[in-house]
Amino acid sequence: MPRYYCDYCDTYLTHDSPSVRKQHNAGYKHKANVRTYYQQFEEQQTQSLIDQRIKEHLGQAAAFQAGAPFNQHMLAFPGAVARPRLPILPTPGMPHGFPQAPLMPGVRPPILPAPGVPGYPGAPPTMPQPGAPPGSMPQPGAPPGSMPQPGAPPGSMPMQMAPLPRPPTLPPPTSGVPGAPIPNSAAPPAIYQANPPAPAGPTSGAPPAPPTAPQPAFSYALPSEGNH
């Protein structure tokens, strides 16, 4: 009678019947062997994928290293044209047509300047100084549109706009006669006089003030008690 072979457990069963297979598959040893088998299979697949990626990376690096000597060998032939290098941006003090140095390996190219920086291409032109000889260069570092002082020598600082004058401050309003001191709340009130006395004599050469007419006195009679 043929016997059943279990691939996970690597063993033969005593009988090849459905009941015996079911009993064997329900055992803890069979389940542990199945779990171990699939863990090993997953590890093998992961390792094979890692090895494949490493081989691809090494192949690309080897092809790049082999291509560098080949390019140098091709440049040795007459009539070969070298690959153009990246251009270098000129500095403000560098004249036009200045030979550009080749880029060194591992050195970053210069950073583009901010738009509007004086001295670089694309910056707004600066106005020349009035009275300066023709062909003179404007003052470096001056803001665009700044006007230098008229008649100033070349290279002088541009004329700066004076700030607007501040409006005059008005004094606080005062009550009473103009020019009188501000009354104090703690001082006693002055006694009002209807006709102030004339001065004793002239003090500054002015004519004396005319005398004032006396005020008429009014008297009122009190009503008697018999009138009530």
Swiss-Prot record:
Gene Ontology BP terms: mRNA 5'-splice site recognition; spliceosomal snRNP assembly
A Gene Ontology molecular function term for this protein is: pre-mRNA 5'-splice site binding
Xref: PROSITE patterns: ZF_MATRIN
Name the segments for region: Disordered: 105-228
* GO CC terms: commitment complex; U1 snRNP; U2-type prespliceosome
Keywords recorded for this protein, A-Z: Metal-binding, Nucleus, Ribonucleoprotein, RNA-binding, Zinc, Zinc-finger
Keyword Heme included in the entry's annotation:
no
The domain of life is Eukaryota
What segments bear the compositional bias annotation Pro residues?
107-156, 164-175, 196-214
Where are the zinc-finger regions (Matrin-type) in this chain? Answer: 4-36
Q: Where in the cell is it found?
A: Nucleus
Alphabetized SMART domains for the sequence: ZnF_U1 (SM00451)
Primary role: Component of the spliceosomal U1 snRNP, which is essential for recognition of the pre-mRNA 5' splice-site and the subsequent assembly of the spliceosome. U1-C is directly involved in initial 5' splice-site recognition for both constitutive and regulated alternative splicing. The interaction with the 5' splice-site seems to precede base-pairing between the pre-mRNA and the U1 snRNA. Stimulates commitment or early (E) complex formation by stabilizing the base pairing of the 5' end of the U1 snRNA and the 5' splice-site region.
Subunit structure comment from the entry = U1 snRNP is composed of the 7 core Sm proteins B/B', D1, D2, D3, E, F and G that assemble in a heptameric protein ring on the Sm site of the small nuclear RNA to form the core snRNP, and at least 3 U1 snRNP-specific proteins U1-70K, U1-A and U1-C. U1-C interacts with U1 snRNA and the 5' splice-site region of the pre-mRNA.
Q: Which family does it belong to?
A: Belongs to the U1 small nuclear ribonucleoprotein C family.
Q: What name does this protein carry? A: U1 small nuclear ribonucleoprotein C-2
Taxonomic lineage: Eukaryota, Viridiplantae, Streptophyta, Embryophyta, Tracheophyta
